[in-house]
Amino acid sequence: MPRRKKKIKEASEGQNLEKKDLETTSSVSIKKKRRLEDLFIVISDSDGEETKEENGLQKMKTKQSNRSKCLAKRKIAQMSEEEQFALALKMSEQEAKEVNNQEEKEEELLRKAIAESLNSRWSSDASAARPRPLSTGPSSHPHQDSTKDSGTTEGIWQLAPPSLCKGSQISQGNEAEEGKEPWDHSENPEEEPLSGSSGSQDQSSRPVFENEKVKCFDRCTGHLAEHTQCGKPQESTGSGCAFPKAVQGRGDTSRQCLPTPADTKGLQDIGGTVHYYWGVPFCPAGVDPDQYTSVILCQLEVYQKSLKMAQRQLVKKRGFGEPVLPRPPFLIQNECGQEEQTSEKHEGLSEDVRAGAREERQGSGASVWHSETKDSQKSPITSLKQRLLLEEEPTTGRGQSSQGLFVEETSEEVLKSSEGDDAVPASQSIAVLTSKRDLVLMPEASTEEVTVCPETQLSSFEPLDLNGEDSVDGREIPTELGMTVSNRQVDNREAGKDSRPPAVSASARVSCPLCNQDFPPTKIEQHAMYCTGLMEPETVLTRRRREAKKKSDGRTAAQPALDISRKEKCYLCKSLVPLGEYQCHVETCLQLANVDRENGTEGMRRPRVCAPVEGKPKQRLRKSKEKGHSQGRLLSLLEQSEHRTTGVERTPKCSEAGAFRMPSPDVEEAGCSRERQSSLSKLNLNESPIKSFVPVSEATNCLVDFKGQFAFRSQTKSGRGRRRKS
């Protein structure tokens, strides 16, 4: 049983497929019939009367379509989903193809219909234009040709200006097929070569011209140009005219060619008339077309000329300025000098002042000072200038060393010139020099100065005030020391200046134990801090180091002298000591403590009264070496005192402290003087104070445990990290 059912199903499916094929073929044939019927569309001027045959065909079409729809519905109902889907795809593809083909055919039919209507209109225009005269000449013989387009008609084909008929040619060129054929012209020297191109028509509607002479009229120049036309010209589809086109192309719309016979007198009588043709522009009703087109051409010419004028005004070439070139600094200084010259003229200064200022500005570096020393003998202005500069220089630090190089030569000449010469008032010269001070020093400021270290040069020409230095530093300079002291005077560079008193009569100087050079007492400590033991006659000082020296000198000078009245507490004897005597007092206390430690209890009973030294003021030791040793001993004694205070040794310490408090100030002064003499005798000048320095990491007597401190911090940090993680 099931086998028979399968066979029946297969047979039914085969029948269904055959029916579908028949339906598709019938539908295709019906559509083809529709296309054929559509092809036979006739464009006519009638109102579209329908014939009886068309009505019968439409009835048959409707019946067949209804039948095919019913059959298709039945077949689709019997088909499976996959078959229905495949059938739908096929049907959609076929419909799409049919629609595309139908659209293409309709477009072709429309083009043909438009071309036929245009051909019929051209024939009517040609017949209407026959009685219209185109020129007022005595003879006009236009060429005629017979064309065959639904009848034989005769027309006149004329050359029209390209500016008038260009728009119609473009608008109608898309609808008809176009072709191009060259024109050959014999050139006139007054006219540019022309070439024409126009839309092509069918061979039946194409007129033929052979060896026709055409004359073109140029409105701009007013000349006529003859051209022989060979070959087969083509007419435009819009107006039935062949248009020449300018190849060289100036954009000139006023050039045009007029149709003329072989005789040239007719065109000369016409002059500048413009013939109007339908198309472009469309002339309004009631207006002469020739006048209308001539007005439009004039407007185009005016517009073109105004446009060119505007473009010429817009484009203007701008001149370039002078190039900006880098200039060396001396040129800039010369310009500054020129500006100053103008300002000096307004101020009414003399010519010698300006000459001296120019000469001084041109120098740079060390040459400035040499030129000043030479010019100081000639003009008093330069000497006053040097005097002002010397007064402005600071008296401490590098100021003394820089002044000592040139002041000795010019100091006497300044005085002589200031007394002898009174040509220029002093007030004016000083004002001018103060205003120009910065410009004189410009070359020095531009380059980094290379100065000589003040410690390696002689002292300044001013006498040293020992009492003043003591008050500034808060210390006392020893007058009689068991050290190498040399008394030097400033060397005079000129032999005639020996009678002048020396700048420094007898100044105490201290020699450095490393480099064996002499320095004043106020400079030896600063030199010892940076001394390396090498002989450096000249050291380079940068601006930063000079500024640092200035600041340090200013700080030492700004220390108040009232620091002497301050009192500090001695941690050995527990007594208040003036600040000036504190160091000496501490040293004596330490020495006494060492002696007591060696001799036992005898040191406490021994009187500490020393014979006073008469005729000597209060003095102190200033060696930084002893400072380092005393600091180390002070720390050790502090540790011992802390150990003694705990336990049995507390009472003797108190008695010892009481013994230290007892002595009077006179006794302490005597002890200080005696200990100072003994310490001076034991001084070794070959040892530098920098050698006694002990770094913090190697200090054994220090109370602070740096290693333990660091370990404790690391433990705390690790503990914090663990807490945060938890």
Swiss-Prot record:
Q: Where is this region: Zinc-finger-like region?
A: 512-589
Q: Where is this region: Necessary for interaction with NR6A1 N-terminus?
A: 100-200
UniProt PTM comment = Sumoylated.
Superkingdom of the source? Eukaryota
Detail which positions bind Zn(2+): 512, 515, 527, 531
The cross-link Glycyl lysine isopeptide (Lys-Gly) (interchain with G-Cter in SUMO2) sits at 20, 31, 75, 90, 245, 436, 551, 569, 616, 707
What are the recorded GO MF terms, alphabetically? DNA binding; histone binding; K63-linked polyubiquitin modification-dependent protein binding; nuclear retinoid X receptor binding; ubiquitin-modified histone reader activity; zinc ion binding
Question: What keywords are annotated for this sequence in UniProt?
Answer: Chromatin regulator, DNA damage, DNA repair, Isopeptide bond, Metal-binding, Nucleus, Phosphoprotein, Repeat, Transcription, Transcription regulation, Ubl conjugation, Zinc, Zinc-finger
Q: Where is this motif: LR motif?
A: 60-78
Basic and acidic residues bias (residue ranges): 9-23, 177-188, 640-653
A single cellular component GO annotation: BRCA1-A complex
Give residue numbers for the modification (Phosphothreonine).
51
Mention any Pfam family matching this sequence. Answer: RAP80_UIM
Primary location: nucleus
* Region Necessary for interaction with NR6A1 C-terminus, residue ranges: 400-507
- Residue ranges of the UBZ4-type zinc fingers? 509-536
Chain positions covered by the region annotation AIR? 270-400
The free-text domain note is: The tandem UIM domains form a continuous 60 Angstrom-long alpha-helix and mediate binding to 'Lys-63'-linked ubiquitins. UIM1 and UIM2 bind to the proximal and distal ubiquitin moieties and recognize an 'Ile-44'-centered hydrophobic patch. Since UIMs don't interact with the 'Lys-63' isopeptide bond the UIM-linker region between the 2 UIM domains determines the selectivity for 'Lys-63'-linkage, and its length is very important for specificity.
Describe the task this protein carries out.
Answer: Ubiquitin-binding protein. Specifically recognizes and binds 'Lys-63'-linked ubiquitin. Plays a central role in the BRCA1-A complex by specifically binding 'Lys-63'-linked ubiquitinated histones H2A and H2AX at DNA lesions sites, leading to target the BRCA1-BARD1 heterodimer to sites of DNA damage at double-strand breaks (DSBs). The BRCA1-A complex also possesses deubiquitinase activity that specifically removes 'Lys-63'-linked ubiquitin on histones H2A and H2AX. Also weakly binds monoubiquitin but with much less affinity than 'Lys-63'-linked ubiquitin.
Q: Write down what this protein is called.
A: BRCA1-A complex subunit RAP80
> Which species is listed as the source?
Rattus norvegicus (Rat)
Q: In the UniProt record, what gene is named as encoding this protein?
A: Uimc1
